[in-house]
Each structure stands twice: as C-alpha cells, then as structure tokens.
Swiss-Prot record:
Catalytic activity: (R)-4'-phosphopantetheine + ATP + H(+) = 3'-dephospho-CoA + diphosphate
Site (Transition state stabilizer) location in chain: H17
Stored CDD domains: PPAT (cd02163)
Source organism phylogeny: Bacteria, Pseudomonadati, Pseudomonadota, Alphaproteobacteria, Rhodobacterales
Protein name: Phosphopantetheine adenylyltransferase
Gene: coaD
Organism of this sequence: Dinoroseobacter shibae (strain DSM 16493 / NCIMB 14021 / DFL 12)
Binding positions (ATP): T9, F10, H17, G93, L94, R95, E103, H128, Q129, A130, I131, A132, S133, K134
Family note: Belongs to the bacterial CoaD family.
This protein's pathway: Cofactor biosynthesis; coenzyme A biosynthesis; CoA from (R)-pantothenate: step 4/5
SUPFAM superfamilies per record: Nucleotidylyl transferase (SSF52374)
Length: 171
C-alpha cells in the first residue's frame, strides 16, 4: 500500500490545499493529511476545528478518487510523522520560487534523517498560486470576500470569526 503524507497547518484549508489533496490522492492508496500543531504560529482555528474542516472537505475527494484520506495531527518532526503513519512519500505543494527554496532545504534535511522517504512536489495550478491561508485570514479580517479562495464551509467559519464581508472592502 502506497501511503503519502501531505503536511501543513491548514489554518484554514484553502482551494489551493484541496487541489493538491485531490491530485496527491491519485498518487497513493492512502493519503494522510498531517495537521501541524505549531504553537508559534498562533492559529486562528483550533486543532479540532482544522481537523474537522479537513475531514469534511476531503470526504468528497475520497469518494471521487477512491483513496482513503485521513487527517492526522502531529507535533513532532515531519520525518518522524511520516515514519509514524507509514508514509513512503511526503507531498508538498509549490506556489512560487520562494516555496521551492524553502522546500529544497527541508528535503535535504529530511533525506539526512531518513533517506527512504521521498518528497514529491506538486505545482499549484495557476488559479491557486496566489492563495495563502495567511492572506485569506487577512482578507476576512479586513472585511473582504474570501469566496474565490475557500469552500463555502470554510467561508462560513471565517464569517463566524470576523463577520460578513463589507461591501466597501474592495474599494
């Protein structure tokens, strides 16, 4: 069984994340979404909320692709999480050159820690390259409409936190 690990904070999960999840699920038999517990980032959504959002959003992808997709919180080293879940590959999405530079360094470190686990990069589709969870939260906080960047469920969760979009936010 081919198991892949797609790690991230997913605060919140975006259409870009879901695109990578959908495409990654065609490469493996089981896709583990590693939900990072990163206390330094101070997430907007709790771990439980992020896991619940991912599980809800991934159910349709799993049904579509036939791949088992599970959310798995982790707080240890990424390579240790990969070992814990039996992953033979770590899947990372790339949006820009800056992402590649960071990921290139991480691959080198992970290979030194365990050279049996490969890293696979999937390029973000053009329409998702500018999407970042940090920017989505900022748009929502400032009263903008996040509809182009997240699903309706995630948009509703952001509206619960920040209120509805303001009509003049884009002006």
């Amino acid at each position: 069984m081919r198991i892949g690990l797609y790690p991230g904070t997913f605060d919140p999960v975006t259409l870009g994340h879901l695109d990578i999840i959908r495409r990654a699920s065609t490469l493996v038999d089981r896709l583990v979404i590693g939900v990072a517990i990163n206390r330094d980032k101070g997430p907007l959504f709790s771990l439980e909320e992020r896991v619940a959002m991912l599980e809800a959003e991934c159910a349709a992808v799993s049904a579509e692709t036939g791949t088992e997709i599970v959310a798995h919180p982790f707080e240890n080293l990424l390579i240790d999480c990969a070992r814990d879940v039996g992953a033979s590959m770590i899947i990372r999405g790339l949006r820009a050159v800056a992402d590649f530079e960071y990921e290139f360094q991480m691959v080198g470190m992970n290979r030194r820690l365990d050279d049996s686990i490969e890293t696979v990069f999937l390029m973000a589709e053009a329409e998702h390259q500018a999407i970042a969870s940090k920017l989505v939260k900022e748009i929502a906080r400032l009263g903008g409409d996040v509809t182009p960047f997240v699903t309706s469920q995630v948009r509703a969760a952001l509206v619960d936190r920040f209120g509805p979009p303001q009509m003049n936010a884009a002006q």
